A protein has these predicted regions:
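Generic hydrophobic alpha-helical scaffold/packing signal
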Residues: 5, 47, 51-54
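Sparse, context-dependent recognition of short Cys/His-centered cofactor- or disulfide-binding micro-motifs
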Residues: 1, 17, 31, 86-87
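Histidine-centered nuclease catalytic patch
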Residues: 18-48, 57-73
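Short, charged surface segments at domain edges that flank catalytic/cofactor-binding sites
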Residues: 1-15, 40
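Extended charged
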Residues: 61-148
Length: 148
């Protein structure tokens, strides 16, 4: 993760994505959607984190607001970093994984909202990335079934 850490520090500054704390050298790089759930190492799923937030979050499901923030990062910057360090962004995989994880959650499941903060899962207003058509055109087709 050293190339990611260096590139993210240069592009986004040496600050924890979650709490904004200034980061020392060698800070953790965190998987927003936990590696244990999705196994995605793409740049779209990675952020700089302080040791406190990284340890507190561990493998917890992040709050919707955190996923929103990570997906709202400048994609051109992530693509530029990807080319420079030869590391995939995997944004489509991150969106699909987040959609699948959150759609399968029961109401009020606890999610990690920051250091020692739990936010109950509530999708009263579904984020755009949870919609099946997010980021792509949808082809409409019709199928006729004839019973014989």
């Amino acid at each position: 993760m050293t190339p990611v850490r260096a590139a993210f520090t240069e592009a986004f500054g040496p600050h924890c994505f979650y709490c904004g704390m200034h980061l020392p050298a060698g800070n953790p790089v965190d998987h927003v959607l936990p590696w244990s759930l999705v196994g995605i190492d793409g740049l779209a799923n990675l952020v700089l984190a302080c040791a406190k937030c990284n340890g507190d979050k561990s493998c917890a499901l992040p709050a919707i607001e955190i996923v929103d923030r990570v997906l709202e990062r400048d994609q051109a910057v992530l693509e530029e970093i990807a080319r420079a360090i030869q590391w995939p962004t995997q944004r489509d995989r991150v969106v699909a994984a987040a959609r699948g994880i959150f759609r399968g959650q029961p109401p009020d499941v606890p999610t990690w909202g920051g250091y020692r903060q739990t936010i109950r899962f509530d999708v009263a207003f579904e984020p755009e990335w949870m919609r099946a058509t997010y980021g792509r055109a949808v082809a409409m087709t019709s199928i006729t079934i004839a019973w014989t």
